[in-house]
Amino acid sequence: MVLSAADKTNVKAAWSKVGGNAGDFGAEALERMFLGFPTTKTYFPHFDLSHGSAQVKAHGKKVGDALTLAVGHLDDLPGALSNLSDLHAHKLRVDPVNFKLLSHCLLSTLAVHLPNDFTPAVHASLDKFLSTVSTVLTSKYR
């Protein structure tokens, strides 16, 4: 999926509102995913998955940092996310459907925290962005 110029503008503007909360929003999205889609917990058997756990917060920071990196490289997502794609495909072997589930939870989290900025156009752009990130992260599964 190709991001239009308007999509890129919307994604950058929305992510600028996220600011220093990217890790917190990432952790909240993970918690939403674990609650809404309990099978996703199987990838984290060594984690304390309780609300506010240090491990979920740390992984949420990784998610937030990766998305911040992606927002900064919208014109070269495959290059920017190559190492993460390798990690998830070859070492962690995460089922690709889980990226879609996390994307859904990220959109919900952003909608809750940025209600005035989460317009239909921004929602559509963020959805396309997260879908593109998911595609890039699963590209090395083949």
From Swiss-Prot:
A GO CC term attached to the entry: blood microparticle
Keyword presence, Heme: yes
Keyword Lipoprotein assigned: no
Domain Globin: 2-142
Residue sites binding heme b per the record: 88
InterPro entries per the UniProt record, alphabetical: Globin, Globin-like_sf, Globin/Proto, Hemoglobin_a-typ, Hemoglobin_oxygen_transport, Hemoglobin_pi
Positions bearing Phosphoserine: 4, 50, 103, 125, 139
Keywords: Acetylation, Heme, Iron, Metal-binding, Oxygen transport, Phosphoprotein, Transport
Tissue: Red blood cells.
Modified residues (N6-acetyllysine): 17
GO MF terms held by the record: haptoglobin binding; heme binding; iron ion binding; organic acid binding; oxygen binding; oxygen carrier activity; peroxidase activity
Disulfide bonds: none
Pfam family, one: Globin
Positions where Phosphothreonine occurs in the chain: 9, 109, 135, 138
Any single biological process term in GO: hydrogen peroxide catabolic process
Modified residues annotated as N6-succinyllysine in this record: 8, 12, 17, 41
Family the entry assigns: Belongs to the globin family.
Annotated function: Involved in oxygen transport from the lung to the various peripheral tissues.
Name the record gives this protein: Hemoglobin subunit alpha-1/2
Species assigned in the record: Equus hemionus kulan (Turkmenian kulan)
